[in-house]
Amino acid sequence: MINYANQEVHFTGCPCCAYARHEFELPCGMAYENDRFTLSQDWELPIPGFFIVSPKRCIDTLSGLTKKERDEMFEIVDRTIRILRNHKVCDRFNVLFEEKENRHLHIWIMPRHEWMQEVAPYITDQLGAVLDYALEHMKTEETYKQIDEITQIVRREFNE
């Protein structure tokens, strides 16, 4: 895998499980983790404020979580969005569940930055265009610095 900072990352097996076991790290580090979940900047896409919440348990569907796990996962999503809003990272977000075949369930917390509206007026219908734009135009030192700063804010707020 190539991470958002254009670095090659090696791991074995399921990438979410490998990340939870700390087999690889992101340049910005993990924003938050507990016994059941990880929260981090998206690994591959250089979009400031684009976070991923993933269970540490290897499951591939939302229904595979217990009610307690679902409640906790949504609390992490809600808290992350509140932190990002309070720090003026973004005002609006899309929250997407990714249940790919033979892949680990995770939730995308996708900020709706102004540039996205210019690239794709209907962001959820044209998500591929937004992601392609980020990969092509946002791999810059300025973006990496923003990602680091935002991750530090989220980490600090979760650890208070």
State each model region's role.
Residues 1-160:
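HIT superfamily nucleotide-processing domains
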